[in-house]
Structures are given as C-alpha cells and as structure tokens.
Regions:
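Conserved ABC ATPase "signature" region
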Residues: 70, 121-141
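Hydrophobic anchor residue at the start of the ABC signature
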Residues: 160
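Conserved ABC ATPase signature
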Residues: 145-150, 154
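Q-loop/switch helix immediately C-terminal to the Walker
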Residues: 93, 100-114, 126
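Conserved structural motif at the start of ABC-family nucleotide-binding domains
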Residues: 2-4, 19-21, 82
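Conserved ABC transporter NBD signature motif
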Residues: 58-70
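The feature captures the beta-strand-to-loop junction immediately N-terminal to the Walker
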Residues: 35-37
Length: 161
C-alpha cells in the first residue's frame, strides 16, 4: 500500500513551492491516475514517489510510505527492489523512456540478464503474454519495432507490460 501524507516539494535554489500538502493512499490492486491542470505538480509528485528528484535540488517534506516503510528515508542504492518491481510510473511522454536506436525487444531484454538461446526464447514467450495482457497481441511486430514506429499509447502499454 502507498500512503502519501502532507507531501510538499520546494526548490532549494528559488524556494518556490511546487507541490503543497498533498495526501492520498492507494491500496494493493488499485491503480491511481494523477490528473490536474498543467503545472499543478502531478509529475513532481510522481517523481518524488519514485525517488527520481535530486535531493540536492529539492526540499521534500511529508511522508511517502510503501507498505509501511518510509521511502523518503531509504538510501538510493536500496531502491532497486522497489522501482519497477513493486511500483512503476508511466511518463507522460513515453518516447523519452526508450532509446531511439534500439528495437523495443532488445531494450526489454536489457533489463534481464539472459544466458543463451533457451532463456531468450522463454523470455520472448513471457513478453508476448505480457503484451497480450495489455491488448497488444502482435508481439513479434512490437518486439521488432523501433520506438518511433509506434504511437505514444502503444508505447505506454509496452511500458506497462
């Protein structure tokens, strides 16, 4: 469960408050969409939850708890078991999340150390099933595409898979 309590984000340089006293919780199995006007702090809040804000540039106040653990106090080198495995974020512009010169299948393989043809084949099977789960049934086409060949919505679904 994710619990955000009285979260405020301020720049250290200009002292500008970017997010003021945001609180919400999300239970296991629930999805959350942050919606609001441009500049209202949606992306900053998401980046804070994912610990993607440079602590030298921002003052963070409040609490971000994941399953009871205070995430703002966790050391950055301990976040590997958290980001992507337990909690994820889909950016507004998915084009910025992919390397433009690599096919999507290759980029997805980079996250998993695959040894040999057998593991690669098994991975491709799991990947095809995950893509089908997000209504992308033509896995071979997706795997062999470059990011610029697909729509933003399709790329967002690839990220979810």
């Amino acid at each position: 469960m994710l619990t955000v309590t009285d979260l405020s984000i301020r720049t250290k340089q200009t002292k500008e408050t970017l997010v003021r006293s945001v609180s919400f919780s999300v239970k296991s199995g629930e999805a959350l969409g942050l919606i609001g006007e441009s500049g209202s702090g949606k992306s900053m809040t998401s980046k804070c939850i994912m610990r993607l804000l440079n602590p030298r540039l921002f003052d963070l106040r409040g609490s971000v708890k994941w399953n009871g653990k205070e995430m703002l106090a966790v050391k950055l080198n301990e976040l590997d078991g958290y980001r992507g495995k337990q909690i994820s974020m889909i950016p507004q512009n998915p084009m910025t999340a992919f390397a433009p010169m690599l096919k999507l299948g290759k980029q997805m393989e980079l996250g998993f150390p695959l040894k040999g043809r057998r593991e690669r084949t098994q991975f491709r099977g799991r990947l095809a099933a995950a893509l089908a789960d997000v209504n992308l049934p033509d896995a071979e086409k997706i795997i062999n595409s470059y990011p610029h060949e697909l729509s933003g919505g399709t790329l967002q679904r690839v990220m979810i898979a």
